[in-house]
Swiss-Prot record:
Domain Helicase ATP-binding: 193-409
Positions that bind ATP: 206-213
Similarity field: Belongs to the DEAD box helicase family. MRH4 subfamily.
Role according to the record: ATP-binding RNA helicase involved in mitochondrial RNA metabolism. Required for maintenance of mitochondrial DNA.
Transit pept. (range): 1-71
Signal peptide location: none
Compartment(s) where it occurs, according to its Swiss-Prot or TrEMBL record: Mitochondrion
Record text about domains: The Q motif is unique to and characteristic of the DEAD box family of RNA helicases and controls ATP binding and hydrolysis.
Listed name of the protein: ATP-dependent RNA helicase MRH4, mitochondrial
């Protein structure tokens, strides 16, 4: 249990008064906004307390409209938030044209699509996908007594991506071939072949926690299965020869080994379920009755930390083709060091589908050279899918430079891109106020204490993620919370770039699965705390995390979006506490919570 060095009654009384003072002080903020020559007073802020009736401890909510409630696109010219989010170093997100991209992404029909059965997904992929999503569903609360009661519906990004990416290639067939000369027929055939083999480039951008992983997995897995089905229809011999061919068919590139492991585990789970094939179209029945299709039957491989590139060759030699390889760009470039293999990149010559996840990271200066060099080794590439939760301005510039013909880019963006889910409640805590008197760690300890006593997540281990800006801060904060505030060693860990990948995996395990029942936790923990940096702010699917704490503001709006997105995922509720002091306090921070509730876009 956490100790702050004060008796419980005294602590509760002090903190109640302190946080009430913080929230009350917000009412002194007002902002005048010029609208067509007239002045309009922004609404007064809302003030709340963080389950204080149950815990006896109040955590202040800084959701006032104040100086910065109008955040991002559409903010008034006179608002502080508009200046902060749309100019200067903090503002790094590209928002121009997003509404148009969402309109052209097929989302105008999203209200009519309520089931994956309405989307073009291969039958075995659809069933395995739904089973995998259900297996990771955070089943807490009274809504559902059993996972069988949960109906899995496609999210907006899944609808848009599947409708766009999984379209049949439109190839115009000339009607008057008989009337053409031999030369004209050859020209038409070449044009048709070029259209069939042309690389299509998709960008898929959607808010954090919206289901982007399955938005691209459903597409590439369906395409792989459709290709299998075509070989099967040719002849049994052709199909068996294809299965045993030593080739990699698709690749998923990610920036970190943690993300490689995460996507690999998702695919491994999907590949393990026995499939029942209800309501399968007649044309697929014979194909799906083959013994290898009792499960998804895909050959999956990963190259992560500790995995030698030579292992890929061994798997190809022993088991034939690899359907999906999950790795980092750096791992593929390391194939050039395989002196024992003649032409080591030849196994990638048959790759038809490539996903670049967290594309804004893999296209920044530190990764761009490796990423582009890797993709150049895929001469038969049909679909290149770039996936991201944010479109930073620099990423957009890189796309324009790499693909100057914008017609070659097929863009998919959801209406909520760069918006924070309304399921996330954002609260600000000012560490300069009494009783903290400038101590952000004491303010942090109080927030942890309040969360531990708030009565939520009944009978489950509560999990908290704390973000700091520098990796040098991680170990010091962990040590301080242990030594001064008596948090048990078993209940807290720190992860930064200096922690080896093996230890990271062990530390992350409690946060990457649904919350455990108190009685099942081997450490007898009531709370688990992870202290980290932006290393784990991107893409990590922290399942059912309800509480995130930011020790100050991140360095940019991009990092802010990703940190807030570690909670409130897949329509679940979450809370974020931002601890500020005079060094990091910005006038717009206290308005961030209400701006999120208004659906404002972060700029």
């Amino acid at each position: 249990m956490i100790s702050t060095g004060l008796p419980l009654f005294t602590l509760s009384k002090i903190c109640h008064n302190c946080f009430f003072k913080q929230t009350r002080s917000l009412s002194r903020y007002s902002s005048k906004d010029k609208v067509k020559g007239r002045r309009r007073l922004l609404p007064r802020p809302n003030t709340e307390k963080f389950n204080s009736a149950r815990s006896g401890v109040g955590v202040g909510v800084g959701n006032g409209a104040g100086a910065g409630a109008r955040v991002g696109v559409g903010a008034g010219a006179g608002s502080v938030a508009a200046k902060v989010f749309e100019s200067g170093n903090f503002s790094q997100l590209h928002n121009n044209g997003l509404s148009k991209q969402a309109q052209t992404a097929g989302l105008d029909l999203k209200q009519k699509i309520t089931s994956f059965d309405q989307l073009k997904v291969f039958p075995s992929v659809r069933e395995a996908m739904i089973k995998e999503i259900k297996s990771q569903y955070n089943l807490k609360g009274p809504q559902h007594s059993s996972i069988d009661d949960v109906v899995i519906k496609p999210t907006p990004v899944q609808i848009a991506a599947i409708r766009k990416i999984n379209q049949t290639r439109k190839i115009k067939v000339a009607k008057n071939l008989d009337e053409m000369s031999e030369g004209e027929r050859i020209q038409i055939e070449l044009q048709t072949k070029n259209e069939e083999q042309k690389t299509k480039i998709f960008t898929v951008a959607a808010e954090t926690g919206s289901g982007k992983t399955w938005a691209y997995l459903a597409n590439i897995m369906s395409k792989l299965k459709e290709d299998d089905y075509k070989w099967f229809n040719q002849s049994p011999e052709a199909y068996n020869s294809f299965k045993s061919s030593e080739q990699v068919r698709s690749v998923i590139l990610l920036p970190t080994h943690e993300l490689v492991e995460q996507v690999y585990e998702t695919l491994k789970r999907a590949n393990s379920f026995l499939l029942e094939y209800e309501n399968v179209p007649l044309q697929y029945k014979e194909f799906l009755n083959l013994p290898e299709h009792h499960t998804l039957g895909l050959s999956i491989a990963k190259l992560s930390h500790g995995d030698a590139p030579i292992n890929v060759y061994k798997q190809l030699r022993n088991r034939g083709k690899i359907d999906i390889l999950i790795t980092t760009p750096g791992k593929i470039t390391s194939f050039s060091k395989l002196e024992s293999i003649d032409r080591p990149f030849k196994i990638f010559k048959s790759i038809r589908y490539c996903v670049i996840d967290e594309a804004d990271t893999l296209f920044d200066d530190s990764f761009l050279k490796d990423t582009t060099a890797v993709v150049k080794n895929f001469p038969k590439l049909l679909d290149l899918i770039l996936v991201s939760a944010t479109i930073p301005k620099e990423f957009e510039k890189t796309l324009l430079r790499l693909f100057p013909d914008q017609k070659s880019l097929i863009r998919v963006a959801t209406p909520s891109l760069h918006k924070i889910s309304k399921n996330i409640k954002v609260m600000t805590l000012d560490a300069d106020l009494a009783p903290y008197n400038g101590s952000k760690t004491r303010c942090l300890a109080q927030a942890i204490y309040a969360i531990s006593k708030d009565g939520t997540e009944h009978n489950h281990v509560k999990r908290i993620i704390i973000f700091v800006n520098e990796k040098a801060e991680v170990d010091g904060l962990v040590d301080l919370l242990q030594s001064k505030y008596h948090i048990r060693r078993e209940d807290i860990c720190g992860i930064s770039g200096s922690v080896n990948v093996g230890d990271r995996k062990d530390y992350l395990e409690p946060f990457l699965k649904p919350a455990q029942l108190l009685e099942d936790d081997v450490d007898q923990s009531k709370i688990k705390i992870l202290v980290t940096t932006d290393l784990l702010a991107r893409g990590m699917n922290f399942i059912g995390i309800k509480n995130v704490i930011l020790m100050g503001l991140p360095k940019s709006s991009v990092e802010l979006v990703h940190r807030l997105g570690r909670t409130g995922r897949m329509n679940q509720l979450g809370r974020v506490f931002i601890i500020v002091d005079k060094k990091s306090r910005k006038s717009w921070v206290k308005g961030l919570g209400s701006a999120i509730m208004k659906g404002s876009r972060i700029g």
